[in-house]
From Swiss-Prot:
InterPro entries: Ribosomal_uS2 (IPR001865), Ribosomal_uS2_bac/mit/plastid (IPR005706), Ribosomal_uS2_CS (IPR018130), Ribosomal_uS2_flav_dom_sf (IPR023591). It comes from Clavibacter michiganensis subsp. michiganensis (strain NCPPB 382). Residues 250-315 are annotated as: Disordered. PANTHER family: 30S RIBOSOMAL PROTEIN S2 PROKARYOTIC AND ORGANELLAR (PTHR12534), SMALL RIBOSOMAL SUBUNIT PROTEIN US2M (PTHR12534:SF0). This is Small ribosomal subunit protein uS2. Keywords: Ribonucleoprotein, Ribosomal protein.
Amino acid sequence: MAVVTIRQLLDCGVHFGHPKTRWNPKMKRFIFTERSGIYIIDLQQSLALIDKAYDFVKETVAHGGTILFVGTKKQAQESIAEQAQRVGQPYVNQRWLGGLLTNFQTVHKRLNRLKELDLVDFDDTTRGFTKKELLIQRRERDKLEKSLGGIRNLTKTPSAMWVVDTKKEHLAIDEARKLGIPVIGILDTNCDPDEVQYPIPGNDDAIRSVALLTRIIADAAAEGLIQRHQKPDAEGSAPAEPLADWERELLEQGDAAKAELPVEENDVDAEVSAKNEAKSEDEVAAPVHAPESDDATEAKIEAEATESEKAPVSE
């Protein structure tokens, strides 16, 4: 079942490409026709590639992976932040910092610094900091929040990356290729399809087009999260993270209690069955009185009436 229809793609203007003067010949196989000097993208191919990218993102997240949403152009900033936050995935919608992936250890130190500054009360001057020092720390926090706020919970390099406008985000794609990170991206008619493992031919300049395709990728991540949480319950597998000693002790106590439970139930069942057998024996031993018929009852009443008439009346 398709996750989106061609009508939705048409309504959002996904089929509009760049003018003929701005195109990449490698995108020729994704171009349907040309109208008024503008290339029209083949939405049938886009639809098939959307389904392929959707399945990849869903399986990646279901197996514990993360998707980094990247889109720093104005048309994509709002939708990138909104959809990534909706499904709890990291995102970059401001300037891409060089070495964010290839030099992640240094970036991770800056993330720890950001978390430290989040705990500082900048209005409290009784902690040993002057107003000037607190002002400097506040500015540092704001700067880190703007550049790294979207990836504050990222503890390792992402499993895959969603990119809006692969031509503009060439630095991010270069770092992903060096680390072997798969890239899912919107390919306009001026992009190079060889740079992306999961291309989606479409318009990367229209706000509605970017919002629609980003929402589809976010929906795939959301479905993957649902599968990830349902998988341990269905398969009975152990959690991925190691258990603490007190958690393991509680689980062992619970298992021991469950092991004793069937024995108690068997004893109760045996006692109930014994009582039922004793009750049935008493019922068999007791005499059974057949109910009197209607004729016998009438004869008994007539005999009592006759005896009362024959009895002498005392004066």
